[in-house]
Each structure stands twice: as structure tokens, then as C-alpha cells.
From Swiss-Prot:
GO terms for molecular function: imidazoleglycerol-phosphate dehydratase activity. This is Imidazoleglycerol-phosphate dehydratase. PROSITE patterns: IGP_DEHYDRATASE_1, IGP_DEHYDRATASE_2. Keywords: Amino-acid biosynthesis, Cytoplasm, Histidine biosynthesis, Lyase. It catalyses: D-erythro-1-(imidazol-4-yl)glycerol 3-phosphate = 3-(imidazol-4-yl)-2-oxopropyl phosphate + H2O. Its main location: cytoplasm. Pathway: Amino-acid biosynthesis; L-histidine biosynthesis; L-histidine from 5-phospho-alpha-D-ribose 1-diphosphate: step 6/9. Its EC number is 4.2.1.19. SUPFAM superfamilies: Ribosomal protein S5 domain 2-like. HAMAP family: HisB (MF_00076). It is found in: Cytoplasm. One of its GO terms (biological process) is L-histidine biosynthetic process.
Length: 192
């Protein structure tokens, strides 16, 4: 179990992460829609995840959402360590009714986010969909992964977001799987 805390003038966040868990989640970010999405990541990634955030949501949700991505990324990079023996690459397609998303990632050590989604609404309830990219950018920058997210089809914005987060959890699950035939670092360079 990896534990990471991050405190700024805007947020106070604690994350506990077990990559090889059972999909148990205890999420309290102060942003209900984000709680729902992170629960999907834990359940579909089969990781145990506890997140507590006290943020300045009286201003808006931006600082909390971005900083949770950062803190989760910091926990993830610690949890995967040197990546020895891991598959390294992961991908998943996830449908939900009319929506279909694909997430592909590489535990490359090279932070890069390519997000291709045209949400059909700017808000999901009180949640600004622009914050989804802020979450993933924070995660990518600190988890040191390359992440491609494509919403291939979708009409309902909630479904679009949910397929993205479910596919993200499933792609992580594949990438961190131990490959019994891979003895060393999964790179011709010898390091990631």
C-alpha cells in the first residue's frame, strides 16, 4: 500500500493505493461526480484506492480535480517502481449504451496526454467537463506515463466520461500485470 499526501494553499489530499487489490474504493473528494469516476477506476482496475480531499470548492472544483490527478500520479509512480517484469502497455475499449471509448497507455517514463473527446454538454450536473483533461494531465505529469484517450462515439456526456474512466482503469490493470516471461525492464534501453 502506497500512501501519498499533498497539501497546498488550495487543497489537502491523501491517497492510499494498492495496485494489486480487489477494486475496493473509499473516495471523498468533495466533487461527487469525480468520486463516481474514481470509483470506476478502482473497480475496473482492481486496485484498492482511498482518496480524501479538502479543497477550495467554494471557488470551483478546478484545484481539487487537478491536484487529485497529481497526487494519484505520485502514488502510481511509486507503486510501479522500476517496472521490472511488467507488461508496460495497456489498452481497453469500454462501451456504455451509445458511448464507446478507447484508452491506451505506456508506462514509458515520458509524460504525454492526447485527449480526443467532444463532450456533447459542457456540464455533467454541476461538474465542468473541462476538468477531465485537468485530472488526466495532472496524473500523466506525475505518473510519467503516455496516455491516449479517445471517445469514439457518444451522445450522453455522462456516458462519455464514464467509458473513459472505466477504460482508464482497465488499461492500467493490463499495463501493471506481471509478465512471467519478462525478467527485466520492458525496454531495449534497459530503463524507463
Amino acid at each position: 500500500m502506497i500512501k501519498v499526501s499533498r497539501k497546498t494553499n488550495e487543497t489537502d489530499i491523501s491517497v492510499e493505493l494498492n495496485l494489486y487489490g480487489m477494486g475496493k474504493a473509499s473516495i471523498d473528494t468533495g466533487v461527487p461526480f469525480l468520486d463516481h469516476m474514481l470509483d470506476q477506476v478502482a473497480r475496473h482496475g482492481l486496485m484498492d484506492l482511498t482518496i480524501k480531499c479538502d479543497g477550495d470548492i467554494q471557488i470551483d472544483d478546478h484545484h481539487s480535480v487537478e491536484d487529485i490527478g497529481i497526487t494519484l500520479g505520485q502514488a502510481f509512480v511509486q507503486a510501479v517502481g522500476d517496472k521490472k517484469g511488467l507488461i508496460r502497455y495497456g489498452y481497453s475499449y469500454v462501451p456504455l449504451d451509445e458511448s464507446l471509448s478507447r484508452v491506451v497507455l505506456d508506462l514509458s517514463g515520458r509524460p504525454s496526454l492526447k485527449l480526443n473527446v467532444s463532450f456533447t454538454r459542457a456540464m455533467i450536473g454541476t461538474f465542468d467537463v473541462d476538468l477531465i483533461s485537468e485530472f488526466f494531465q495532472g496524473f500523466v505529469n506525475h505518473a510519467l506515463v503516455t496516455l491516449h484517450i479517445d471517445n469514439l462515439k457518444g451522445i450522453n456526456s455522462h456516458h462519455q466520461a464514464e467509458t473513459i474512466f472505466k477504460a482508464f482503469g482497465r488499461a492500467l490493470r493490463v499495463a501493471i500485470t506481471e509478465d512471467e516471461r519478462q525478467e527485466g525492464i520492458p525496454s531495449t534501453k534497459g530503463s524507463l
